[in-house]
Amino acid sequence: MKKVYLAGQANEYENNWKEEFKKLRNFSFHDWEFDSDQTSPDTFFPDDLKGIKDADFMVANPGVAPSEGTWIEIGYFYGLNTKKPGNFCSKLIIIWKKERKPIWSIDFVNKTGYIVSSVKEAIQKLEEIARKHD
């Protein structure tokens, strides 16, 4: 079973976006809202990083608001899953909504992993790349 770390916005701010992933078969998920001790940064930060380190894939949804924590999670996963800086990470999916700003940064983000614009596209991409990594 492939493990997926779900990074990004909390369900309450993004229409329960993570719940659609959890319906998928053949995957297990680390959802920081439930699987990391949210008592304080002293507990959730190491729990989140352990979940990322143990993951085969990451789906990140930074939403449209500032998402500093999400970008830290993405960077850590990217660093663990590429051989050298600048490589494309074939295990990383980022949901980049069309209304996300600033738009100039999408050129940079495109170099990191797969960029999709919706949860539906992210689910399709996850299923596709999981087959390639069997």
Predicted ranges, named:
Residues 1-134:
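Conserved catalytic or regulatory cores that recognize and/or transform ribose-phosphate-containing ligands
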